[in-house]
Amino acid sequence: MTNKIGMNLLLWGTEINTSLFSVLEQIKAAGYDGVEVPIFDTNPDHWKPWREKLDELELDRVAVTINGPDHHQISADPSMRHKALERNKMALECAQVLGSSLLAGPYHSALGVFTGSKSSEEENKWAAENLFELAEHAKDLNITLGLEYLNRFESYLVSCTDELIALVDRVNHPNCQLMFDSFHANIEETNLGDAIRKMGNRLVHVQLSENHRGTLGAGHVDFKDILTALEDINYHSMISIEAFSSKLSAANIWRNMFDDEMQLVNDSIQYLKSI
């Protein structure tokens, strides 16, 4: 495997501040090439010291973001949709300051918001319109949108590869592309490798997560099959490891499936390189 390997900083919780700079140093020492940096603070000035530190450590970076109930992009309320769009535009501004050419995540709709029904044609239209305008802003900043689908328990707009492809087709913008997260795919897809092959050259980012959100190789996800599929489509971009702990309340993690963060960091990269 020749892809660069990254680590998602959400393992340490949602407080993404300079106290994590020592963690960045440990991640670099463990052999990682980059990190996923969650953009929750949408003040661009917040990310200037982050760019400096990542440049100092020669760590690549991918910006990721998530929207909560207050920024629901497919709300029936036009003011809410506008608010969500403006918030995501600010996330793009922060990604640019950070030095990332990609904004990844499920920001097509709000996490954990449901209506009791599948998405309507009107909601699908709102999503595509919102994302097209966001992609236009991303184009001005030389950033690509990497859209992620979530599983059925976290999102009702898109929860599988086919639905995500349909949404991105509807957006129809070169700066709006696809990403893959093995945690959600493990729940929703019949075959993980086939899902990746279906994404093909539109796949711009990959997150590898174990079925229990713990150390890679300690669960039942077939990562060898995933890596084979990535080779089949000539995927050469970063592969990020995503694991969560009880520090991330939104993920509903009630027990940690690892000894400590650095055990997970070290064992996961060693496992991935051994496949």
Describe the predicted segments one by one:
Residues 1-11, 17-28, 99-101, 158-180, ...:
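Histidine-acidic metal/acid-base catalytic patches
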Residues 11-14, 39-43, 70-71, 151-154, ...:
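Short histidine/acidic/glycine/proline-rich micro-motifs that form metal-
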Residues 33, 37-128, 236, 240-248:
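Structural motif corresponding to the early beta-alpha repeats
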Residues 36, 148, 154, 189, ...:
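Acidic-residue sensor for enzyme active/binding pockets
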Residues 78-177, 259-262:
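Active-site acidic/histidine proton-transfer and metal-coordination neighborhood
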